[in-house]
From Swiss-Prot:
<dbReference type="GO" id="GO:0005977">
    <property type="term" value="P:glycogen metabolic process"/>
</dbReference>
<dbReference type="GO" id="GO:0042593">
    <property type="term" value="P:glucose homeostasis"/>
</dbReference>
<dbReference type="InterPro" id="IPR036116">
    <property type="entry name" value="FN3_sf"/>
</dbReference>
<feature type="glycosylation site" description="N-linked (GlcNAc...) asparagine">
    <location>
        <position position="695"/>
    </location>
</feature>
<feature type="short sequence motif" description="WSXWS motif">
    <location>
        <begin position="620"/>
        <end position="624"/>
    </location>
</feature>
<feature type="disulfide bond">
    <location>
        <begin position="434"/>
        <end position="445"/>
    </location>
</feature>
<dbReference type="GO" id="GO:0014009">
    <property type="term" value="P:glial cell proliferation"/>
</dbReference>
<dbReference type="GO" id="GO:0010507">
    <property type="term" value="P:negative regulation of autophagy"/>
</dbReference>
<feature type="glycosylation site" description="N-linked (GlcNAc...) asparagine">
    <location>
        <position position="698"/>
    </location>
</feature>
<feature type="glycosylation site" description="N-linked (GlcNAc...) asparagine">
    <location>
        <position position="514"/>
    </location>
</feature>
<feature type="topological domain" description="Extracellular">
    <location>
        <begin position="22"/>
        <end position="839"/>
    </location>
</feature>
<dbReference type="Pfam" id="PF06328">
    <property type="entry name" value="Lep_receptor_Ig"/>
</dbReference>
<dbReference type="GO" id="GO:0051049">
    <property type="term" value="P:regulation of transport"/>
</dbReference>
<comment type="function">
    <text>Receptor for hormone LEP/leptin. On ligand binding, mediates LEP central and peripheral effects through the activation of different signaling pathways such as JAK2/STAT3 and MAPK cascade/FOS. In the hypothalamus, LEP acts as an appetite-regulating factor that induces a decrease in food intake and an increase in energy consumption by inducing anorexinogenic factors and suppressing orexigenic neuropeptides, also regulates bone mass and secretion of hypothalamo-pituitary-adrenal hormones.</text>
</comment>
<dbReference type="GO" id="GO:0017046">
    <property type="term" value="F:peptide hormone binding"/>
</dbReference>
<dbReference type="InterPro" id="IPR013783">
    <property type="entry name" value="Ig-like_fold"/>
</dbReference>
<dbReference type="GO" id="GO:0038021">
    <property type="term" value="F:leptin receptor activity"/>
</dbReference>
Length: 1162
């Protein structure tokens, strides 16, 4: 049997560097790329010969070549096989096209791998590589997977990643040396290999150079050089907290938590699968942390995943988050449950699906408990599919068996689904709380009536029943109870005091609400005074910070009452206006002190203690009086102060004055005070010595040695600081320049940013010190100590824009202080920008001044604008009729806007052009006593005669009337009368001889007939030969001298005699009388015209239905229309029957006239 032994085929793949520039590195994309290596006959020429590379192998003769030997040992015979083949490795797509190799076209040199082997004559070696920066920006990861046709196995492969990360950013760096690359071992598994490269956060924007070395089955491969920027290939972590909910609008809201660790904004890609009546898959990219999916459908399921990426498009998409599934029911209620209180409002939304069909919101009806249909006025249509119902002023839910909620159903017009929403409405009962004082002498009970519904006319009262011992298991309202007087306090609570009390007796209490409709009792509660004790607070409370241990020690003494075991609670905090309290529990009843760990040992703490029964019954006592700690040293200072120096003297001389400056230690560093500072000096020749500077924060000494080291110590009452800062002054180190550049940019008057670059050196940089001051001023220098790895720093100070500042940056090494970089003023670009922005400071004041000027102009022209747009309201005091009126009295305005208090004279009213005739007759006596008229009568003819019936129709009422007298005549009238335009006439008749008869008769109320027939009336005969026949005839009666209202009683015979009087009026023996006028109105205003005015200002209207019906005039309140002994003269010159006059009446007379007099309107 022959055994064959295979020797390992060794492939050495050497990388050829073109030493032209660093741009030979291949810039990889921030996503997946592929590495192809293969013999010439496996791919086309484009794969084997990159752009700019020659196709023949003779161009590579100058390169060093590795020999691959395949050795077979068969039966102890060594058989070597040699063949030479040139292999190329490049990056490209899966088909091997557009394969890139790095060449230098100017010199014709190619970066390639030269390989001699016959084992890869037919197959190439290909890998799939992906690189990214981890989301927390701490680790750079490259993942490599072999393609399916790769002949090597991962488990037999060893992969190393070699990388170089420069120290500084430079546009034209030198080519990297091979020895400068660092090696990282990659972890390989069956699926692939993964390499981890740690990248400092400060170098994320630097160019990272790297390449891969792969060893498998004894064969080594080396990839081309790759270049990338870690910040551009960041792969964030998948979003967390993915959840979904249905909004009030019926949309599905997908939300997730934002990644707060990412230093840049992110975009998110949401992938969801909707499975409802149709299957829909969508992916959307958003910048917010939520996404609304329109029109959520009932009976659907949504599977959602989210991933993130940098918002600017660079970087790598994160992995998808874990899928979340959200399923909706056939009927969707949102929200499905509501818990609310009495009197509030609540709304439900619903989407109804029936047999794979969405019901329109217009067809949805709502039911409560499937027994009460909710009125449609409470419905609202949110969208075509979403319906809303609103409950206003909710009442308490009535329990139905075990159901303590109302079931709200969203139904179709034909049927309801079994799913429902739940509505909980809670009514809070009246809570009675009682507490017994610390001396165990009285019990105070409090309760609030706010939970009682507003009930008009109700009263509240506390009633109680005392049981001899303890409380019953279930307290109930006792039939014999006593009321307790309670007093309403300012806080709205009622307070009742029970004194004396029985500690072990049970007091059952309840609130009774008394109302006229009945009384209501709140649920009773039983109180045991011994179980509601509020103890007295602990006394003699002390607090202190212990020395060396640094603990807050609190001690107290327990109260005398009660005698039960007590637990204690301590609260403590930093003393100030707003104390942030912390609490500590002490359950040991015998304990009288406690020690607490505090963070600030040098602060003043305020401490209080309270107690309660250990078994939990009763209340906490009030807090004790506060106790305060004293600030004292508890430990030696934690460290010495940070310090810096200021140099004086000539820099060329060997002796210079050095002034040390340091900042006082804080309490937390000094623990808790500093009594003095000590400066230690160390030199090579003079040894070591110390100086005590007391509480000063500076010290000046003479620097004469080549190297002088100083240390500043802080000393308190317990000793000196253990950790201190050293500063070495060295002449050789003062010439070391480590700062290449320094720039200062003003951001505002209170902030300046400094940026710098450092040059590499052989010294160990400890930290940097920034100095700044006003240029050409020795005083006012300020300084800051910053870490050595910082490249820029924000200085916050009060910078004066017109001043020039000097900025200095000192590198501090272990060996001493290096040479500073000093700049005078800000960087030129920043100054130009400020000068360009100076125009803004000029434009803004101009705009503000213009606005102020415009506002002033508007205020000055306010009166003109007011007259232009609004009419000027006249001042009543400038009117003649308002002279002498006091507008401060309310009565003035009452008379002013209702009726004038005095007569207002108008000119004569112009009559319409119509024929006028008048006749005045005065009769002194009646023919017989029975026919006498007990009052003066004035006839006013206002109607038109009916040519057919020869009658006069006065009113719409057709009733016959008897004129009281010796004779009576039956009068008939027509129902309707045709009225024609006419002029009003009046006849004035006075009889002073009938006064006594009038007084004897008294007040007679006998209405005159509403209609007078011309066929039986003696008036027609009396007026047959006069001008009255041509006009309409109506009678108007006025009382004569009677203090009361008189309705005359007439007969036609007496009226006939009255009209036959043609005598003269006597003028002597009569005093002047006032006259009452009749108003004349247009015939077109017959229904509402004014007919009668008087001296007292009576303005009356005469409706047709009231003509000759109960006509009265108040004689003593208005002017006498006809006096008893009226004398107008025989000629009648002095009597003017028509003088239209509009006058006013007093308020009192006006009211009487309105109440007791009929309107006189035709």
């Amino acid at each position: 049997m022959m055994c064959q032994k295979f020797y390992v085929v060794l492939l050495h793949w050497e990388f050829l560097y073109v030493i032209a520039a660093l741009n030979l590195a291949y810039p990889i994309s921030p996503w997946k790329f592929k590495l192809f290596c293969g013999p010439p006959n496996t791919t086309d020429d484009s794969f084997l010969s990159p752009a700019g590379a020659p196709n023949n192998a003779s161009a590579l003769k100058g390169a060093s070549e590795a020999i691959v030997e395949a050795k077979f040992n068969s039966s102890g015979i060594y058989v070597p096989e040699l063949s030479k083949t040139v292999f190329h490795c490049c990056f490209g797509n899966e088909q091997g096209q557009n394969c890139s190799a790095l060449t230098d076209n100017t010199e014709g040199k190619t970066l390639a791998s030269v390989v001699k082997a016959s084992v890869f004559r037919q197959l190439g070696v290909n890998w799939d590589i992906e690189c990214w920066m981890k989301g927390d920006l701490t680790l750079f990861i490259c993942h490599m997977e072999p393609l399916p046709k790769n002949p090597f196995k991962n488990y037999d492969s060893k992969v190393h990643l070699l990388y170089d990360l420069p120290e500084v950013i430079d546009d034209s760096p030198l080519p990297p040396l091979k020895d400068s690359f660092q090696t990282v071992q990659c972890n390989c598994s069956l699926r692939g290999c993964e390499c981890h490269v740690p990248v400092p956060r400060a170098k994320l924007n630097y160019a990272l150079l790297m390449y891969l070395e792969i060893t498998s089955a004894g064969v080594s491969f080396q990839s081309p050089l790759m270049s990338l920027q870690p910040m551009l290939v960041v792969k964030p972590d998948p979003p967390l907290g993915l959840h979904m909910e249905v909004t009030d609008d019926g949309n599905l809201k997908i939300s997730w938590d934002s990644q707060t660790m990412a230093p840049f904004p992110l975009q998110y890609q949401v992938k969801y699968l909707e499975n409802s009546t149709i299957v829909r898959e969508a992916a959307e990219i958003v910048s917010a942390t939520s996404l609304l999916v329109d029109s959520v459908l009932p009976g659907s399921s949504y599977e959602v995943q989210v991933r993130s990426k940098r918002l600017d498009g660079s970087g790598v998409w994160s992995d998808w988050s874990s899928p979340q599934v959200f399923t909706t029911q056939d009927v969707v209620y949102f929200p499905p449950k509501i818990l609310t209180s009495v009197g509030s409002n609540a709304s439900f939304h619903c989407i109804y699906k029936n047999e794979n069909q969405i019901i329109s919101s217009k067809q949805i009806v709502w039911w409560r408990n499937l027994a009460e249909k909710i009125p449609e006025i409470q419905y609202s249509i949110v969208s075509d599919r979403v319906s809303k119902v609103t409950f206003s002023n909710l009442k308490a839910t009535r329990p139905r068996g075990k159901f303590t909620y109302d079931a709200v159903y969203c139904c179709n017009e034909q049927a309801c689904h079994h799913r429902y929403a739940e509505l909980y409405v809670i009514d809070v009962n009246i809570n009675i709380s009682c507490e017994t004082d610390g001396y165990l002498t009285k019990m105070t009970c409090r309760w609030s009536p706010s939970t009682i519904q507003s009930l008009v006319g109700s009263t509240v009262q506390l009633r109680y029943h005392r049981r001899s011992l303890y409380c019953p298991d279930s307290p109930s309202i006792h039939p014999t109870s006593e009321p307790k007087n309670c007093v309403l306090q300012r806080d709205g609570f009622y307070e009742c005091v029970f004194q004396p009390i029985f500690l072990l007796s049970g007091y059952t209490m309840w609130i009774r609400i008394n109302h006229s409709l009945g009384s209501l009792d709140s649920p009773p509660t039983c109180v045991l005074p011994d179980s509601v004790v509020k103890p007295l607070p602990p006394s003699n409370v002390k607090a202190e910070i212990t020395v060396n241990t640094g603990l807050l020690k609190v001690s107290w003494e327990k109260p005398v009452f009660p005698e039960n075991n007590l637990q204690f609670q301590i609260r403590y905090g930093l003393s100030g206006k707003e104390i942030q309290w912390k609490t500590h529990e002490v359950f040991d009843a015998k304990s009288k002190s406690a020690s607490l760990l505090v963070s600030d040992l040098c602060a003043v703490y305020v401490v209080q203690v309270r107690c309660r029964r250990l078994d939990g019954l009763g209340y906490w006592s009030n807090w004790s009086s506060p106790a305060y700690t004293l600030v004292m040293d508890v430990k030696v200072p934690m460290r010495g102060p940070e310090f810096w120096r200021k140099m004086d003297g000539d820099v060329t001389k060997k002796e210079r004055n050095v002034t040390l400056l340091w900042k006082p230690l804080t309490k937390n560093d000094s623990l808790c005070s500093v009594r003095r500072y000590v400066v230690k000096h160390r030199t090579a020749h003079n040894g070591t010595w110390s100086e005590d500077v007391g509480n000063r924060t500076n010290l000046t000494f003479l620097w004469t040695e080549p190297a002088h080291t100083v240390t500043v110590l802080a000393v308190n009452s317990l000793g000196a600081s253990l950790v201190n800062f050293n500063l070495t002054f060295s002449w050789p180190m003062s010439k070391v320049s480590a700062v290449e550049s320094l720039s200062a940019y003003p951001l505002s008057s209170s902030c300046v940013i400094l940026s710098w670059t450092l040059s590499p050196d052989d010294y160990s940089l400890l930290y940097l010190v920034i100095e700044w001051k006003i240029l050409n001023e020795d005083d006012g220098m300020k300084w800051l100590r910053i870490p050595s790895n910082v490249k820029k720093f924000y200085i916050h100070d009060n910078f004066i824009p017109i001043e020039k500042y000097q900025f200095s940056l000192y590198p501090v090494f272990m060996e001493g202080v290096g040479k500073p970089k000093i700049i005078n003023g800000f960087t030129k670009d920043a100054i130009d920008k400020q000068q360009n922005d100076a125009g803004l400071y000029v434009i803004v004041p101009i705009i503000i001044s213009s606005c102020v000027l415009l506002l002033g102009t508007l205020l000055i022209s306010h009166q003109r604008m007011k007259k232009l747009f609004w009419d000027d309201v006249p001042n009543p005091k400038n009117c003649s009729w308002a002279q002498g009126l006091n507008f401060q009295k309310p009565e003035t305005f009452e008379h002013l806007f209702t009726k004038h208090a005095e007569s207002v004279i108008f000119g004569p009213l112009l009559l319409e052009p119509e024929p006028i005739s008048e006749e005045i007759s005065v009769d002194t006596a009646w023919k017989n006593k029975d026919e006498m008229v007990p009052a003066a009568m004035v006839s006013l003819l206002l109607t038109t005669p009916d040519p057919e019936s020869s009658s006069i129709c006065i009113s719409d009422q057709c009733n016959s009337a008897n004129f009281s007298g010796s004779q009576s005549t039956q009068v008939t009238c027509e129902d309707e009368c045709q009225r024609q335009p006419s002029v009003k006439y009046a006849t004035l008749v006075s009889n002073d001889k009938l006064v006594e008869t009038d007084e004897e008769q008294g007040f007679i109320h006998s209405p005159v007939s509403n209609c007078i027939s011309s066929n039986h009336s003696p008036l027609r005969q009396s007026f047959s030969s006069s001008s009255w026949e041509t006009e309409a005839q109506t009678f108007f009666l006025l009382s004569d001298q009677q203090p009361t209202m008189i309705s005359p009683q007439l007969s036609f015979s007496g009226l006939d005699e009255l009209l036959e009087l043609e005598g003269s009026f006597p003028e002597e023996n009569h005093r002047e009388k006032s006259v009452c006028y009749l108003g004349v109105t247009s015939v077109n205003r017959r229904e509402s015209g004014v007919l009668l005015t008087g001296e007292a200002g009576i303005l009356c209207t005469f409706p047709a239905q009231c003509l000759f019906s109960d006509i009265r005039i108040l004689q003593e309140r208005c002017s006498h229309f006809v006096e008893n002994n009226l004398s107008l003269g025989t000629s009648g010159e002095n009597f003017v029957p028509y003088m239209p006059q509009f006058q006013t009446c007093s308020t009192h007379s006006h009211k009487i006239m309105e109440n007791k007099m009929c309107d006189l309107t035709v």
